[in-house]
Amino acid sequence: MGQKVNPNGFRYGVTKKHNTLWYADKKDFADILLQDDKIYRFFNKFTREYLIGKVEIRRNQNGHLSVLVHSAKPGAILGQNGENINKLTQDIQKLLRNKELKLNIEVVNIKNPDLNAIILAEQIAIKLENRAPFRVAQKFAIRNAMKSGAKGIKTQVSGRLNGVDMARSEGYSEGEMKLHTLRQDVDFAMATARTTYGAIGVKVWVSKGEFLDGNGEKNVTTEKN
């Protein structure tokens, strides 16, 4: 079953923390959930520009909204003298139609972007759009991830590869990838490359080892006897 479901959703509440954390009354739940969806879609547009690897949303009982943006280019999000992040704040307030919204955007630096599945998937998609061979694009990402300390990585591209008439899927993997083991820390992401031959789907799985029993933060390497 672990091979068929989204590895992130499979682990939320077990070994992965939810990206959204808040409580709301029943009458307000739908509106707040819709706001979260708009915020996620807003930052998805900047994934490539700012190398955004994760977005977290936190709300307190006073209605204060905090958005944590994990990025490999925090300086680009902040802008000179914080001008860009102020603009992003105003854009979100306008999107949610609430200029009085207490909103705080925090930028978290991603120390190792080569272990982030979202960034790796977007890098492969960019190379495909620049007409790089799909094998080279995947192996480049695999090599960088393994050098950065990944325990395993798996990639897959699907579509009209190299412009052939019949669409197909092709992927590569290296290291361990236990999708059926919930204590295995697996990061998963998808991206789309818009090429002259049509859309090509990209999937990336990154394994960072196994969680210790009762600890959701520290990882250990799995060794085979």
Curated annotation (Swiss-Prot):
Pfam families: KH_2 (PF07650), Ribosomal_S3_C (PF00189). SMART domains: KH. Residues 39-109 form the KH type-2 domain. One of its GO terms (cellular component) is cytosolic small ribosomal subunit. Keywords: Ribonucleoprotein, Ribosomal protein, RNA-binding, rRNA-binding. It comes from the Bacteria. InterPro entries: KH_dom (IPR004087), KH_dom-like_a/b (IPR015946), KH_dom_type_2 (IPR004044), KH_sf_prok-type (IPR009019), Ribosomal_S3_C_sf (IPR036419), Ribosomal_uS3_bac-typ (IPR005704), Ribosomal_uS3_C (IPR001351), Ribosomal_uS3_CS (IPR018280). Gene3D superfamilies: 3.30.300.20, Ribosomal protein S3, C-terminal domain (3.30.1140.32). GO terms for molecular function: mRNA binding; rRNA binding; structural constituent of ribosome. The keyword Zinc does not apply. GO terms for biological process: translation. Coiled coil: none annotated. Binds the lower part of the 30S subunit head. Binds mRNA in the 70S ribosome, positioning it for translation. Belongs to the universal ribosomal protein uS3 family. Part of the 30S ribosomal subunit. Forms a tight complex with proteins S10 and S14. This is Small ribosomal subunit protein uS3. The gene is rpsC.
